[in-house]
UniProtKB/Swiss-Prot annotation:
Pseudouridine synthase that catalyzes pseudouridylation of mRNAs. It catalyses: a uridine in mRNA = a pseudouridine in mRNA. Belongs to the pseudouridine synthase TruD family. The active site is at D284 (nucleophile). InterPro entries: PsdUridine_synth_cat_dom_sf, PsdUridine_synth_TruD, PsdUridine_synth_TruD_insert, PUS7L_N, R3H_PUS7L, TruD_catalytic. GO terms for biological process: mRNA processing; mRNA pseudouridine synthesis; pseudouridine synthesis. NCBIfam families: tRNA_TruD_broad (TIGR00094). This is Pseudouridylate synthase PUS7L. GO terms for molecular function: pseudouridine synthase activity; RNA binding.
Amino acid sequence: MERNTLSCFISDHEGFNGTIKNSPQDFVVIEIDTNGQFVNSVNTEEEERPCQTTKRIGKLKPSKPDDTDSLIQDCFDLNLILGLSVNRELEHFTNKLKVKPCSDDQEKVELSLGTFPDKHMRAVVHKAVRFNFPFLQTLTNQSEIRVREDPDFQELAGLASEGEAEDFFRFIDAKTPGSVFTFLPDDSKEHRTSVHHFVSRRFGKLVETKSFVDQQKTCITVRLRERGKQAKKRTMADCQMQEESLYTAFTLRKENLETLEAISYMAAVLGVLPSDFTYAGIKDKRAITYQAMVVKKISPERLLEKGSEFERRGMEISRVRPAFEALKLGRLQGNHFELVIRDLKHHGKHGLAELPKVIEEAVENVKNKGFVNYYGPQRFGSGSCVQADQVGLALLKENMEASVKLFFTPEDDDDLQNKAKRHFLHTGNAKESLVLMPAYKARERLMLRALHRYGSGQEGCTRGWLSLPHSMRVFYLHSYCSRVWNQAAKYRLQKLGFKPVQGDLVWAEPVKGLKDATEELSAPQIHVVTSDEEKNEVFSLDQVILPMPGNSVKYPENLLGQWYQDRLAQDGLESCRFRVTPLKLNVPGCYRPLLAKPQNITYSLQTSSSDESNTHCLSLNFDLEASCYATVCLGEIMKTNLS
């Protein structure tokens, strides 16, 4: 089956050819917030309260967050933060500790990382070092930061495994109120008691622990206390959490920049971590985009001070104001698009004189009938040799070594990152490849650092994946499931037609957008179309939903249901549980409408004359719900595969 061909259309208009994204100005994306307002709206009372203007007329509804659209990427690259020479000293220091840990009666060996006069930069160094080396303590003496072995880590590593101890200390350092960490099952009550006592003694003011039984095995969970439930006495930890409760909201305008690239630069300028920024969704690179953001631990005044530095990198900030909490993924109604399609031409049947009529028919068809709600090419990455869904398939099979090889498969280009990938595949030398890998490739560098430390076998590759943020690991699994969904949608329309048929799935009650399979999903919420309902045409095609594979979804009860089983078996996943336990990944699945419709769609056809010829361009504006793709909508309008 062709991987990238989304050629199944639902309208029969002729369509036309044209080019998109000739420049960022031709592709403008404006986020629509949960109140139906553009996030770049201007209000004279902005400093007092959030903007209340520019309500949309259409019927976009808040949709279920699709966390796979968001490639959240924490950047703890010590080469960037400390410098190459200091980081090498630190790695040498940690290697010596691994070989010969300090005993209790030995004097603690320390290493100086240098002086950092800026307190925000000191916070970055503390967090980055502890993330990369959880077994180290970081100490500040005036402006100097020193590191030494953490005896608490060694104690916990003696009670649990070293890997669990690392994950636990990262969990503690993240300081996310209400978050939970679960130790591996432990049948020894005496041993569990020791773990309880350790956590209570060392972190009792921050966390609470309890044991629970899961599949006849007992586990310990640790929950970070909510802020209101912590002891009232102010401690250093309380002060730090109070500082971290400072939030500033703003709108980011960026041009020709990845969302994560923009965040990494802003974090470096402000002296915070990329993980201190939150947003509702990832936006296109080759575009001008406006999106809401919230940054932690930075005041509005400090953010505004850095505005000129951001502008030098193609970013502008506006609507800067205090906020009470971080922004959650999926917290938007959708996106507004202002697009220009250039170099318009017919597919071949008519002359240019007929172009206005052809365009009008195409736009009206999609306005009334919608388009097949395929996942767009952004979902699968930009690679031509290996795409994200292939990595996801290897992870679902728990073939860690194969997944890492796919992850590092280079493109045909000869730039630095592909040279580094090529070197790793040819030599297996993670350390040398790390030196070659550009500093801005944070994911690859995190993976290489872990492979250098733990080796490139099955266990080392597992640790390599665990070095990446959870959202990045699960992205690859969701990419595979999205590929299957796209192919299922094409099969459904080609084999079963353009009307609901017996066995199709619909919502028992009206629901907009994606619905996660774990969100209180009971059987009555999913309705299976009956023979009588098919005969009486009770439902329309835009009510049909298709499951994205997972362990909590119901499959159609017709040919399409069997197709899903055959398709998964084709990839060796006939008994897949859609859980990758070593990587702490779970894919419940979700339900996605087969069709989507643009709202508030307008267009205008323009002609520009030159000495040689007349050229036509189409300006097209519309709104889409979250998780819908403008390029897919354009593909239906133009009758062209833009993937």
